[in-house]
From Swiss-Prot:
Belongs to the asfivirus KP93L family. The chain crosses the membrane at residues 20-40. Encoded by inverted terminal repeats (ITR) sequences. It is a single-pass membrane protein. Keywords: Glycoprotein, Host membrane, Membrane, Transmembrane, Transmembrane helix. This is Uncharacterized membrane protein KP93L/DP93R. It is found in: Host membrane.
Length: 93
């Protein structure tokens, strides 16, 4: 009988401990989910802005047989504006 009394006290103790752990795990998972959603939202907003920009500061130069629509790196110097995108009107046969 004494054994069952100790067992019951221990069960109550572990039940309370388990409830605290479950509550803490649930709280941490909720906080992690909120942080993850904020992270995704920020990346989505960042991609909307960066998708409108030329990738890697590359400027498209007009077609000639020697460069064949090559991409060249654009390096700005002293408040210059990058050249506009141009596409050649002639198509190779």
């Amino acid at each position: 009988m004494f054994f069952f009394g100790i067992f019951r006290c221990n069960m109550d103790h572990w039940t309370t401990k388990r409830q605290v752990y479950i509550y803490l795990c649930f709280s941490l998972m909720t906080i992690a989910l909120i942080c993850y959603l904020i992270h995704i939202c920020c990346h989505t907003k960042k991609n909307v802005v960066t998708n409108a920009l030329p990738s890697n500061n590359m400027a498209l130069i007009p077609y000639t047989p020697s460069n064949n629509m090559a991409l060249i790196p654009y390096t700005p110097s002293n408040n210059t504006v990058p050249p506009p995108y141009t596409i050649s009107g002639s198509c190779p046969q």
